[in-house]
Amino acid sequence: MKGVYFVSGIDTDIGKTVATGVLAKQLLQQGKSVITQKPVQTGCQNIADDIAVHRKIMGKPMQEADKQGLTMPEIFSYPASPHLAARLDGRALDLDKIRTATQQLAAQYEIVLVEGAGGLMVPLTENLLTIDYIRQQGYPVILVTSGRLGSINHTLLSFAALKQYGIRLHSLVFNHIHDSRDAHIAQDSLNYLKCRLKADFSEAEWMELAKTDAV
């Protein structure tokens, strides 16, 4: 594993932040040089909350790259999708600033995990979806799903979008923290999605996030 990877989810609040932090921690334990980035954070000021969670999970203090703003290049105060948060803050989202920050991190670290906002179809601007940006940059995707009711549908829609856009799926992360309270639904979702991943993206990895990984 080397390079820049985009961490997305099948929905908002699906566990991307914890998954990103846990994956970064595992890579650190393997001796890898890794950093996480939250290119667009909404609902915050000055510091990206998700980056703080990443560092806590990784067992690391805020890094020099964090202090330089490279890991959180765009922060908006209103908790909404980036296109709306930018409009309400009265300024445009600077895609060049984000691209440059990611490139600088990639030059310093072996692996950069870029956590997106929401799912693949979340608008970054009025004219650009998150999935458009991922395709433009050529990033492989790490997709976070769960065992809660509706996850099969949302995951298959995400699979279809990735195929349509010609984007490589690196791995599917099944988040047990957000499992359905119904054990039958949770287990069936896991079994079904594991089979579909093998059928639809045979080279992609299957990963699981345990309940004990909850922050």
Curated annotation (Swiss-Prot):
Domain of life: Bacteria
EC number: 6.3.3.3
Keywords assigned by UniProt, alphabetized: ATP-binding, Biotin biosynthesis, Cytoplasm, Ligase, Magnesium, Metal-binding, Nucleotide-binding
Chain sites annotated for binding ATP: 13-18, 50, 115-118, 175-176
Ligand binding (substrate): 42
Protein family: Belongs to the dethiobiotin synthetase family.
Protein name listed in UniProt: ATP-dependent dethiobiotin synthetase BioD
Organism: Neisseria meningitidis serogroup C (strain 053442)
